[in-house]
Swiss-Prot record:
Membrane-crossing residue ranges in chain numbering: 36-56, 92-112, 127-147, 176-196, 200-220, 240-260
Subcellular location: Cell inner membrane
Keywords: Cell inner membrane, Cell membrane, Membrane, Transmembrane, Transmembrane helix
Name the UniProt record assigns to this protein: UPF0761 membrane protein HSM_1104
Species of origin: Histophilus somni (strain 2336) (Haemophilus somnus)
Length: 288
């Protein structure tokens, strides 16, 4: 019991120290700025990839709804109009304009890569060609993976909901299905924490950090939506420009949740290293 309390105390000390060391608030602000610049290019690339695969035409609506509810709570209608405008405008762009947008999107991925690796205290640098290949795969395959996951979850939800409706005694199952977006978010964060760092990250540590990030992300989304709908004074202040500060604030909160989860995963790895070191020390003492 004493060892457990000691480990918990050490964990929180290490977590707070690393939080200050990595300046997560500043890092979240930096990623918010990068995301704002790359938002339009990312949307353009995502939906351009979907357009290249007719199989995803049926879930485009579900994908937009996923973006609205998770990344733009309470401003879904306005963001939906912007997305349609972005996609339509991208069809009229020149090759130079498209390349420029792709470069901006790749720069965001690079920013995420560098920020997460700094949390794991990894200062190694990949070869430029290797990094470009990884970023390009993320930019092109990422939308396909996300669309496939959303499509599967949507299909399972609809099928299971229909099945449960045939049996009133299984109403609990319908409530469990409402957690599908949460599990999808948890899965995406887990993959993010495993794939992006240059160091090998345990799936247990990644899943633990991703779980906390998904919880904060989901609770933050609900609290943010409640505040926006309950205290709409921001509309009186900003008027037609209200969507912009709302988006910026939500992006900031989202990145804070993501970085906190990453920090938790990294600290768990640090704690494991400390435990291994203590075991080695004890063995050396016993041998003496």
């Amino acid at each position: 019991m004493s060892n457990l309390c000691r480990n918990i105390k050490v964990f929180f000390k290490v977590f707070l120290y690393r939080f200050k060391q990595n300046k997560l608030n500043q890092a979240a602000g930096y990623l918010t700025y990068s995301t704002t610049l790359a938002l339009v290019p990312l949307i353009m690339v995502f939906f351009s990839v979907f357009a290249a695969f007719p199989v995803f035409n049926e879930i485009t609506g579900e994908l937009k709804q996923f973006i609205f509810t998770n990344f733009a709570p309470s401003t879904g209608d306005a963001v939906g109009e912007y997305i349609d405008q972005f996609v339509n405008n991208s069809k009229q762009m020149s090759a130079v304009g498209i390349i420029s947008l792709i470069v901006v999107a790749l720069m965001l991925i690079h920013s995420i890569d560098r920020t997460l690796n700094s949390i794991w205290l990894d200062t190694s640098v990949r070869p430029a060609i290797f990094s470009f290949a990884i970023y390009w795969l993320i930019l092109t395959l990422g939308p396909i993976v996300i669309a496939t996951s959303i499509g599967i979850s949507t299909y399972v939800t609809k099928f299971a909901t229909y099945t449960f409706e045939q049996d009133l005694g299984l109403s609990v199952g319908i409530k469990l299905l409402s957690l599908m977006p949460f599990f999808l978010t948890w899965f995406i964060f887990t993959v993010l924490y495993m794939v992006v760092p240059n160091k090998k990250v345990s799936i247990i540590h990644s899943a633990a950090g991703a779980l906390i990030a998904a919880v904060f992300f989901t609770l933050g989304k609900q609290a943010f939506t409640w505040y926006i709908t309950t205290f709409p004074s921001y509309q009186l202040i900003y008027g037609a420009m209200a969507t912009l500060p709302i988006m910026l604030l939500w992006i900031q909160l989202s990145w804070t949740a993501v970085l906190l989860g990453a920090q938790l995963s990294a600290v768990l790895a640090d704690m494991r290293s400390l435990d291994d070191s203590n075991i080695q020390i004890e063995k050396m003492k016993e041998e003496k």
